[in-house]
Regions:
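Long alpha-helical scaffolds
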Residues: 36, 241-242
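Domain-terminus/edge residues, biased toward the C-terminal soluble/receptor-binding domains
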Residues: 59-63, 71-76, 80-238, 244
Length: 244
């Protein structure tokens, strides 16, 4: 297999929690294969699922040939596709950041030390992850994520000549984003945006509320120029029964 490993033994048992920790912190390729086999029955079947999901997400320049990213003919992607995948991961599965923000930890009752391969976790304020990768062909790569003042950014660096370069270039991109942009909150989860009449209901009206927070990315200092117009479904009244 090659690459980063924690040298799993066929006789030992690790929990999913421990496997995820090893994958996220030290890029354990053997754990990637073990998890793929656990989820799909084999690495090959898991890779099929990976490619199917990639197409669903619009990752049009990506073809996976394995589950760990080691160089293989036809195994390709782009920085844009990595950004799409990273966004999907941190927005739909935010619990992953409990692993990607670990700087140092251990497995096997402290016998196996884990130190995060992503140095920004320790050195960059607000860093939430996400993943490093390096091979002799792809060189040094990084999908870096960070959050400050409600604004989350992703910076993807590919084919850096050295490990230091990938971290420095990612930091430059993140610094630029945080220096020039901010997140403007337009409405909070649960805010009432409209009241709609209900025909033959116990109550004459029903409130339409925001399912989630909503906002927009704006230039720094442009708050005063932001107005919100929440477009609701053009109902003037509802007839029971309704389906939420």
């Amino acid at each position: 297999m090659g690459g980063s490993q924690i040298w799993l033994d066929t006789t030992e048992t690790l929990t999913v929690h421990e496997m995820l920790k090893a994958i996220c912190v030290v890029s354990a390729n053997d754990c990637c294969v073990a998890m793929a086999e656990y989820i799909a029955g084999s690495q090959e079947m898991f890779v099929e699922q990976m490619n199917k999901r990639a197409k669903e997400l619009g990752m049009n320049d990506t073809t996976f040939k394995n589950c760990h990213g080691i160089d293989e003919d036809g195994h390709v992607t782009s920085s844009y596709d990595i950004a799409i995948m990273s966004r999907e991961l941190i927005t739909k599965h935010p619990k992953i950041m409990e692993y990607t923000t670990i700087w140092m930890d251990s497995l096997r009752d402290g016998k196996s030390e884990l130190v995060n391969t992503n140095k920004l976790v320790r050195n960059y304020a607000g860093c939430t992850g996400l993943k490093t990768g390096s091979t002799s062909v792809a060189l040094f790569n990084l999908s870096a994520t960070a959050t400050r003042d409600g604004l989350s950014l992703i910076a993807v660096i590919m084919k850096g000549e050295t490990s230091k370069i990938r971290f420095a270039e990612a930091q430059k991109l993140l610094d630029y984003g945080f220096s020039n942009y901010q997140y403007a909150l337009c409405g909070s989860k649960g805010d009432v945006v409209k009241c709609v009449e209900v025909n033959k209901g116990l109550m004459p009206t029903v409130e339409l509320t925001l399912e989630n927070d909503c906002g927009a990315l704006i230039g720094k200092g442009q708050n005063k120029n932001v107005t919100s117009d929440i477009n609701t479904v053009s109902y003037t009244h509802l007839t029971l029964p309704t389906i939420r």
